């Protein structure tokens, strides 16, 4: 009985490892739409579409200052072009969080941060190089860093959500 349990645990462990390796394998695709600075739509080789949320970066929302500029930058880098991506996880909106590479191993999240169109998303990244890219873009006042009062997307969303929850009372009581 104990031996069967040990064998079963090993089998489950191997299945989990195998699935993890498959999840992290590289996928070839073509970018067919840009939703915002950090979200794109990829056309896979099997003709399926997949929405990809870029890993390790957070760009301004479209309605935020520099949001459209971030979207344009991302478009200029990958729209209509072949890419390779790695699935990392799923977010709460069921989008695939992905690391996207293009043009001889350029890492899209890093390029966005270097150009000053996104924040290093330190809450979900241990890649200190991205922090250095952000600091460099800040010093050079690139992209959104031209605005000394730039508000991070997570702060912008927090304020926006707070205002949406507080509805004014109108009419007679």
Pin down the residues of each PLM region.
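Small beta-barrel nucleic-acid-binding modules, primarily SNase/OB-fold domains
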Residues: 2-13, 18-173
